[in-house]
Amino acid sequence: MAKDVRVGYAPSPTGHLHIGGARTALFNYLFARHHGGKMIVRIEDTDIERNVEGGEQSQLENLQWLGIDYDESVDKDGGYGPYRQTERLDIYRKYVDELLEQGHAYKCFCTPEELEREREEQRAAGIAAPQYSGKCRRLTPEQVAELEAQGKPYTIRLKVPEGKTYEVDDLVRGKVTFESKDIGDWVIVKANGIPTYNFAVVIDDHLMEISHVFRGEEHLSNTPKQLMVYEYFGWEPPQFAHLTLIVNEQRKKLSKRDESIIQFVSQYKELGYLPEAMFNFFALLGWSPEGEEEIFSKDELIRIFDVSRLSKSPSMFDTKKLTWMNNQYIKKLDLDRLVELALPHLVKAGRLPADMSDEQRQWARDLIALYQEQMSYGAEIVPLSELFFKEEVEYEDEARQVLAEEQVPDVLSAFLAHVRDLDPFTADEIKAAIKAVQKATGQKGKKLFMPIRAAVTGQTHGPELPFAIQLLGKQKVIERLERALQEKF
């Protein structure tokens, strides 16, 4: 690449890190790391009324949790700051003044009511996309001075060049063109003195030497406005890549109001999803590697990331696939880390005390290990392991059908006799007892294992049986076997 790669991700602290923002940040990060470049996180905090307390910190913490270790931001000065837009207002003012002096921008005194009336008139005349008429563009310097002297509030608008075609050579979509006639003179500074997004982002990207901009496709229509600012200042714009929409399983654009999908990174973190699984999943949301493999480490993704493989079609956020992928990572997880992930959920659900004894902690560790293959996320340990915390066994319908089979009393009676004598009560001893029951009754396979599982767990599927029996404890297993022998199924 001709110049150093510097990419930027610019969240607003108006909320927490959304899955759409996380995906955008991730592609910026992968591109920068693939090319040995830098990633900058700039905080776009000029929408002061909508900023939420802790929003900025939450955005940064969740990026870092995902494994997006950016190079520059409010907490990592790289010499291109300030990194908050509210701390850059004097910088923007300088460039606004320059445009005013050169006649490329002007003060607009039209009230919101006048502007709305203008839009309504244009709609009534059959204009589908109303735009500003340019009324204040024609004010003389004397008229401007008089209106200012009267204390009339004003915005500042950019003069849109006439008869120009703007071309974007987009890294995802190829060549996209826009005509200046379709864009009215637009506001670069609001009446409160705060610059608008389309103006401030150009100043920031230029001064921070951003070389490539990866962002959502909803920003594509903003690009010609930004190119006008680059042109007026004689600056070279960065290369743009507009990422496809993320859609739900009904192929509709993801809406933050859609409660059928968990949409914030912090929520996945709280549920016990793994950052490396989320990183992997987001990387495949609008980008595809060569071949069929879907599980990649962060380093592998950095190495193979290729812009030419970014998708032009909407990307479906498939929660089932994310859960499957997280399970693949959990299966290979170090047990200490899995305990760290799952144990707090058992405590939070009231299944275990916060101040556990060493014996309780070891039991919990063994329980979590028992479900490592099945667990899709940390919080799932609570419903998965419910049978271990119930006083009375609850039989599923399938378990009742199994327990109604004719060989069951013989199997359970023989197993109960062995259980009473078992000491120590360990998985190995339990395995030996089941083998002895097989020999004594002649039953094997499902006819042997299913009745025992159904009697002690109330289920026909579950974790490895001897270990589950060991964790239930001798007394509870005896009680459950006795009940199954007495009950009519």
From Swiss-Prot:
ATP binds at residue 256. Keywords: Aminoacyl-tRNA synthetase, ATP-binding, Cytoplasm, Ligase, Nucleotide-binding, Protein biosynthesis. GO terms for cellular component: cytosol. Its EC number is 6.1.1.17. A motif ('KMSKS' region) lies at residues 253-257. The keyword Metal-binding does not apply. The keyword ATP-binding applies. One of its GO terms (molecular function) is zinc ion binding. It catalyses: tRNA(Glu) + L-glutamate + ATP = L-glutamyl-tRNA(Glu) + AMP + diphosphate. A motif ('HIGH' region) lies at residues 11-21. InterPro entries: aa-tRNA-synth_I_cd-bd, aa-tRNA-synth_I_codon-bd_sub2, aa-tRNA-synth_I_CS, aa_tRNA-synth_I_cd-bd_sf, Glu-tRNA-ligase_bac/mito, Glu/Gln-tRNA-synth, Glu/Gln-tRNA-synth_Ib_cat-dom, GluQ/Sye. CDD domains: GluRS_core. One of its GO terms (biological process) is glutamyl-tRNA aminoacylation. It is found in: Cytoplasm. Monomer. Belongs to the class-I aminoacyl-tRNA synthetase family. Glutamate--tRNA ligase type 1 subfamily. HAMAP family: Glu_tRNA_synth_type1 (MF_00022). NCBIfam families: gltX_bact (TIGR00464). Catalyzes the attachment of glutamate to tRNA(Glu) in a two-step reaction: glutamate is first activated by ATP to form Glu-AMP and then transferred to the acceptor end of tRNA(Glu). This is Glutamate--tRNA ligase. It comes from Geobacillus stearothermophilus (Bacillus stearothermophilus).
